[in-house]
Amino acid sequence: MGKVVGIDLGTTNSCVAVMEGGKPTVIANAEGFRTTPSVVAYTKNQDQLVGQIAKRQAVMNPENTFYSAKRFVGRRVDEVNEESKEVSYGIEKAGSNVKLKCPVLDKQFSPEEVSAQVLRKLSEDAGKYLGENITQAVITVPAYFNDSQRQATKDAGKIAGLEVLRIINEPTAAALAYGLDKKSNERILVFDLGGGTFDVSVLEVGDGVFEVLSTSGDTHLGGDDFDRCIVDHLASIFKSNEGIDLRQDKQALQRLTEAAEKAKIELSNATQSEINLPFITATPEGPKHLDLNLTRANFEELASKLIDRCRVPVEQALKDAKLSTGEIDEIVMVGGSTRMPAVQELVKRVTGKDPNQTVNPDEVVAVGAAIQGGVLAGEVKDILLLDVTPLSLGVETLGGVMTKMITRNTTVPTKKSETYSTAVDGQTNVEIHVLQGEREMASDNKSLGTFRLDGIPSAPRGVPQIEVTFDIDANGILSVTAKDKGSGKEQSISITGASTLSDNEVDKMVKDAESNASVDKEKREKIDLKNQAETLVYQTEKQLGELGDKVDASAKAKVEEKSKALKEATSKEDYEAMKKLLEELQQELYAIGSSVYQQPGNQPPAPGTPDSNESNDKGGDDDVIDADFTETKD
C-alpha cells in the first residue's frame, strides 16, 4: 500500500499532510506555502490556474475565478440563493443542480469539478514531496455536512483521480491531532469556525480511543460571512457618498472582498485597519476612490449577529452530550476564523474556560486526516475512532410526517430496520422518500431522494410488510434498502431527487479531468521548452561576445546561424523545430568550448604539475615557527 495523504479541503484554504516515521507532517505546496487557497481560475488563454496564482489574478478575472466552491458542493440551486449572490462568477441551474459558469471556456462546471482541481494540486504537490504517485486519501468534511454533501466530496476525490478511503469529520480530525499522545482521559470541545462552515463537537479522548459524544453546527456560517459584513459596510458607505452600488460591478466586488478579508485578518492583531482602494470605479466626472478606517470595535458591532450565532451550536452540543461546561477539560479552537478576538471572547464567556492555543488552527485538521490515513494504511496502531451521524435520518410517512429511523449523534457505522405497510387497499408499489433533518414535517427537512418498490402482492391496507433498512458506513454515507417480506422483492435506493452527481456524470468528469491533466502537462512542457530555447539563445549571444576572436570564424558563423534559426522557431512556436535546434545548438556550443581550451596557453595543468602561480619552494624546517603558549588564570 502506498502513502495515504490526509487532505483538509477547506472553503477558503486547503492543506495536505502525511505520516512520516510515525509522525504527521504538513506538506508545503509547490509555491512553498503550507496552505493552498481553494481557488481555481481559467485565463483568457484557457490555461488553468490553481491556488495562490489563481487567487492573485482574481480581481482582473472575476468571472472565471472560482472560490468557495465548497459552499455549493452537494446542494441544489434552491438551497444556495444567498450564497450565489455573493460570488463574482455566474451560478446556473442544471435540473436542480448547481453549475458554475466559465465564460472563457464557454463551459459549465459542477462545484465537485472545481474542488477536484484543488484536490489534484494538493495530491500532485504531495507526490513530488514524497517521490511517489499519490492515489489514496482521507478527506475531511464539516461534521454538519449532510449525506449529499459527503457523497459529493467523495465524487470530487474520484474526479481528481483519488481513491477516498475515508471521509472524516473536521472536528474529529482536529481531536485526533490534539489527542494523539494523550494518555489520560479528557473531555474536549472542538470549536471549528472555518471559511464557510461552523462545527462544534464534544469528544472523550484518551489512551487511543476517540469517541464523539455529540456534534452540532451551521453549514451557512464561516469567515466568508464575516468578510461579507465588511463588504456590505464599505459598499453602503460608498453608495451613500457617491450614489453607486459597488456590489453590482463584479470587478469592484472582488476588490472589496479581498480588502475585507485583509482588514478582518489585520483586526485580529490591530485595533484598526486602513482600507484604501484607489480607482474602485469611475463616472463621467472621473475616477472614484474608497479610503476609510475600520476599527475592531466597529467590525465586532457589524459582525455581532454572526458571533451570537456561534453560541447556539455550542450549547446544543453540550446538551446532546449531557455535559455541563464544568465537565469539559479543554476547548480546542480550529479554523482561521477562531483567531478573531470576539470569537475567542464568546467561547470564554459560554464555556467559562480559556481556549487551548496549542494547535495550529489552519493545519490541525489535515494533520488529523493524515493520522486517520496512517490508521487505514496500518502505520498507526492502537487508535479507535467512534464518530457520529450529525443529523437524524428517516422516511416520509402518511400525512407528510418524517418518521426518524436513526437519530442524530448515533455512533457510525450503524444499521437499523423498521417495518412499514401500505396506506390504501390493493396497493402494489410504495415510494420511499428518504429524509435528513430534525423537523417534524417531511417538507421542512432535506430530501435525500426517492425510490420505488414494485411488485407488492395486492392486499388490504396495513397487511403487506415492507422492511426498510438504513445503513450508514464509516464515511457517514447512507444506503437504503426496502424489502417486501411477502414476495421477497427488494429494491436499493436509486436517488432521483438528490443533488449529487450520477455515476455516469462522475465517470465523464474523471475522463475530462484526466485528459485536461495531459493537456496541461503538454502545455507546461511547451512552456519549459520555450524558456530553455530563449535562455540558450541569450547565453549563446553572451558567450560569443565574451570569447570574441578566440572563436574560429566558421564555427562562429555556424553557431550564429543555429541561434538565429532557434530564435525564429521560438517566435513561431514551432516546438518540433525548437526541440531539434536546441539540441544542435548545444552541441555546437560544446564544440566551441572545447576548441577554446585547446588553444595554446589555455590548456589546464597536467596532473601532479604545479600551477604557474604557485611557488616551487616546498619550504623546510626553517619555515616552521615555534611558539610557546602560557595559560593565564584570573
Curated annotation (Swiss-Prot):
- What protein family does this chain belong to? Belongs to the heat shock protein 70 family.
InterPro entries on file: ATPase_NBD, Chaperone_DnaK, Heat_shock_70_CS, HSP70_C_sf, HSP70_peptide-bd_sf, Hsp_70_fam
Any GO molecular function: ATP binding
Q: Does the keyword Glycoprotein apply?
A: no
Query: What's the gene?
Result: dnaK2
Under which name does UniProt file this protein? Chaperone protein dnaK2
Sites bearing Phosphothreonine, chain numbering: 197
Membrane-spanning residues? none
**Composition-biased stretches (Acidic residues):** 622-634
User: Which intervals of the chain are annotated as region Disordered?
Assistant: 592-634
Keywords (alphabetical) are: ATP-binding, Chaperone, Nucleotide-binding, Phosphoprotein, Stress response
Which PANTHER family does the annotation name?
Answer: HEAT SHOCK PROTEIN 70KDA
> Which superkingdom does the taxonomy of this entry point to?
Bacteria
- Induction details: By stress conditions e.g. heat shock.
Q: Explain the purpose of this protein.
A: Acts as a chaperone.
